A protein has these predicted regions:
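Extended active-site neighborhood of metal-dependent phosphoesterases/phosphodiesterases
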Residues: 2-17, 96-147
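N-terminal active-site segment of His-dependent metallophosphoesterases
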Residues: 1-94
Length: 147
C-alpha cells in the first residue's frame, strides 16, 4: 500500500499552528534578552562593577518590555532566538523557570532557540530541555542536534 503525502508530512512535523482567518500569520522575534539574576553570579564583581542593579528591577524591566512588545505586535507565534537566559547567572534555574512561566502566561505559542549563553547554567542542557518541554505553550522538542 503506498504511503500518502500527508502521512509522510505528519511523521516529520512536531507542531502545527493555525493562522487566524482573515489576517496574515504574525511572528514576533525576541532575541538576546539575556535575563540575569545578579544574586546568582559566579563572579559578582563582574556585574556590580558595571552597575548595581536589583534582581527585582531587572525582571520588572525585562518583562515590561517583553509584554509591551507582545501587546503591540499581537503575534501568533513568538520566537526567542538565543541568549534568553545568561546561564552563568542562573545556576539555580530560577531565571529560566520565571521566563518560561512568563512566556506561557501570554497563552501564545513560543519557541526558544539556543544561544551561546543559554547552556552555561550548571543545571545543564538536559534539565533546561525538560523545562521547555513541560511548558504548556512552548514549542520545543529535544532532538539530536548539538552545536
Amino acid at each position: 500500500m503506498p504511503i500518502r503525502e500527508d502521512q509522510v508530512m505528519a511523521s516529520l512535523v512536531d507542531f502545527v499552528l493555525q493562522a487566524c482567518e482573515g489576517r496574515e500569520f504574525r511572528i514576533l522575534q525576541l532575541t538576546d534578552i539575556q535575563i540575569i539574576d545578579p544574586g546568582q553570579s559566579r563572579y559578582p564583581e563582574r556585574i556590580n562593577n558595571i552597575t548595581p542593579i536589583s534582581d527585582e528591577q531587572l525582571y520588572a524591566d525585562c518583562f515590561h518590555y517583553i509584554k509591551s512588545t507582545i501587546e503591540k505586535a499581537k503575534p501568533d507565534l513568538i520566537l526567542m532566538t538565543g541568549d534568553n537566559v545568561y546561564g552563568e547567572f542562573d545556576d539555580s534555574g530560577a531565571s529560566l523557570r520565571k521566563l518560561i512561566a512568563y512566556m506561557d502566561s501570554f497563552q501564545i505559542p513560543w519557541a526558544p532557540v539556543w544561544g551561546n549563553h543559554d547552556n552555561e547554567s550548571t543545571k545543564g542542557v538536559a534539565w533546561q530541555c525538560e523545562q521547555f518541554e513541560k511548558a504548556q505553550y512552548c514549542l520545543f522538542k529535544r532532538g539530536n542536534i548539538t552545536g
